[in-house]
């Protein structure tokens, strides 16, 4: 049976949902008996957008700061074909992006 190395990177704006998908991947790996490394948390990106409060430009300069955080996790799996098929069937919630790189 062919063995593959899969690197799964997850990113999303809500860390609880990203961690939930990571736990589903870990559960599939433990059921099939393959080796797993991770989830490794990567640095969180903070995107800040300063916006002027007054629309006309008159008055004092007051600003609102809107922030969005992007949380990332990285998982390495030594998987066979059966495990990869099960990983492809995981329901991914909205707001979570997943990328799978496979090396043979």
From Swiss-Prot:
GO terms for molecular function: structural constituent of ribosome; tRNA binding. Pfam families: Ribosomal_S10. GO terms for cellular component: small ribosomal subunit. The keyword Ribosomal protein applies. PANTHER family: 30S RIBOSOMAL PROTEIN S10 FAMILY MEMBER. Part of the 30S ribosomal subunit. This is Small ribosomal subunit protein uS10. It comes from Thermoplasma volcanium (strain ATCC 51530 / DSM 4299 / JCM 9571 / NBRC 15438 / GSS1). The lineage of its organism: Archaea, Methanobacteriati, Thermoplasmatota, Thermoplasmata, Thermoplasmatales.
């Amino acid at each position: 049976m062919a063995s593959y190395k899969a690197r799964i990177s997850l990113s999303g704006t809500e860390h609880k949902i990203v961690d939930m998908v990571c736990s589903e991947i870990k559960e599939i790996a433990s059921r099939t008996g393959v080796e797993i490394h991770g989830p490794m948390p990567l640095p969180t990106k903070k995107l800040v957008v300063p916006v002027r409060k007054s629309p006309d430009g008159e008055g004092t300069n007051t600003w609102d700061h809107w922030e969005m955080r992007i949380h990332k996790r990285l998982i390495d799996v030594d998987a066979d074909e059966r495990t990869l098929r099960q990983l492809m069937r995981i329901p991914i919630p909205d707001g979570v992006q997943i990328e799978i790189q496979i090396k043979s």
